[in-house]
């Protein structure tokens, strides 16, 4: 390609510290000219990726300046016409990692919904979104390799491992980095529960039981409340906030 796309927040001092208004710039290697293609948007514009056929560019975009927890949307632009489109409207959550499909007609992305980060397929013909994976775990990062997607997967009971995911959702574990350790441990059951809040809404909570839990016995309880509140309590694995250790 004769063009390079990059993201930058061209501000200094206090304005740089409090603003989230970054933009996508395209530098032409032949003319040495730089063009801002997201100047009208006032929030974060990040992670530009060209389509395999070179006809489009996709990027993540937040709408409002100074609001770093804004909805992370997915946009594409037709490089010939300059037409831009908000393509992830059908997914009412953040678009996290994403990658173009080989045919440039599909974008695969990860996103959290109901406490799980799954892999989704976005059909650019009609902007419809379909979940490829399901289950009580999180996928993070996604790359295309042939006819499969390569991604990290973890849960509250397992640290990161690498998986190959077929486009029909069939996942094959490629790494077993901690198998010897897991074989010596017994993990407690993890259960999702929906609770009605004081304002009448439904809230997802996670219950992590001790290993060898006996329902006839009483156990001390620890309540973990997520701070931020810029991230959900999904099926994340943490060496600092490890729920299996807390439950044990």
Outline where the language-model segments fall:
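Short loop/turn segments that connect beta-strands within beta-propeller blades
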Residues: 28-32, 78-82, 123-127, 166-169
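Conserved beta-strand positions that form and line the central face of beta-propeller blades
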Residues: 35-37, 86-87, 118, 131-132, ...
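Hydrophobic beta-strand positions that form the internal "hydrophobic ladder"
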Residues: 4-5, 54-57, 106-107, 149-150
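Conserved blade-ending motifs and adjacent loop-strand segments that build the rim/top face
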Residues: 87-97, 130-141, 175-186
């Amino acid at each position: 390609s004769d063009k390079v796309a990059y993201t930058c927040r061209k501000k200094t001092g206090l304005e740089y510290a409090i603003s989230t208004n970054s933009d996508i710039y395209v530098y032409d290697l032949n003319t040495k000219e730089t063009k801002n293609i997201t100047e009208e948007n006032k929030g974060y514009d990040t992670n530009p990726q060209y389509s395999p056929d070179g006809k489009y560019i996709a990027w993540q975009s937040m709408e409002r300046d100074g609001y770093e927890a804004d909805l992370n949307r997915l946009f594409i632009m037709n490089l010939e016409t300059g037409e831009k489109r908000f393509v992830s409207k059908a997914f009412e959550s953040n678009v996290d990692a994403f990658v173009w499909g080989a045919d440039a007609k599909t974008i695969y992305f990860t996103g959290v919904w109901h406490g799980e980060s799954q892999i989704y397929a976005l059909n650019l013909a009609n902007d419809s979104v379909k979940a490829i994976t399901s289950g009580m775990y999180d996928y993070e990062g996604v790359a295309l390799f042939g006819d499969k997607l390569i991604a990290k997967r973890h849960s509250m009971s397992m640290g990161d491992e690498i998986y190959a995911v077929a486009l029909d959702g069939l996942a094959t574990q490629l790494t077993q980095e901690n198998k010897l350790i897991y074989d010596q441990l017994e993990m407690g059951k993890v259960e999702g529960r929906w609770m009605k809040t004081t304002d009448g809404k439904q809230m997802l909570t996670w219950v992590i039981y001790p290993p060898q839990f006996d329902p006839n016995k009483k156990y001390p309880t620890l309540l973990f409340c997520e701070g931020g509140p810029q991230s959900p309590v999904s099926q994340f694995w943490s060496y600092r906030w490890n729920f299996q250790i807390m439950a044990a």
